[in-house]
Amino acid sequence: MMKTELENIGFTTVESIYSEREIEEILKILNEKEISGQFGVREFLFKNPEIRSKIFNKRLKEIVKQISPKCTNSIKSIYFDKPPNSNWTVNWHQDLTINLSNRKEVDQYKNWRETKERTVVQPNRELLENIFTIRIHLDKCTKQNGALRVIEESHLKGTIDTTEWIKTKVGKETICEVGKGGILIMKPLLLHSSRRTETVSYTHLTLPTTPYV
């Protein structure tokens, strides 16, 4: 069911992956390292390896194995916190890039970009179709506090020109509400956006994951 939903409509949600105690332990580490006050931290797991065992608990490992038994690698990890007094709107887009440790010319890889910390590239469609992203919710995520909005089945259409698509907004829009400790799993080619947080702080960790990188 879960894997079928992910493949067919582009996303699925699973509740209660983390217990209250596990969330408290994660938040304790975030507070001790003064991460909780930051709006976003890229390469989160690389910079904070001690939290990896808390994130990849038994239940999450089982979920990943069900989706892709060969999956062994997380290629990105981003921590986000959107408090009501300082948050932002994310316009409709697809996640088209991955991070690499260094540049190596590969057929159909394009839009290379070098930063101090990483090499960013847009891979071919085949690889993007085999990646799935896990959004871990440390707070309850509702329509009022920035829940992700997605266009069902849009991941099946490859790379989409969003400037043209926005004129018609063809497709079924769904708001992905997730409980505290739950996860949203999605395909990176799925069109998605989020609005400003209206109520309490909204905290989540994003893990694009693939068996191929």
Feature names for model-found ranges:
Residues 203-209:
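Conserved small/polar residues in nucleotide/adenosyl-binding loops
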Residues 13-15:
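Short catalytic-loop micro-motif centered on adjacent basic/acidic residues
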Residues 3-9, 18-180, 193-201:
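Non-heme Fe(II) oxygenase catalytic core, chiefly the N-lobe of the double-stranded beta-helix
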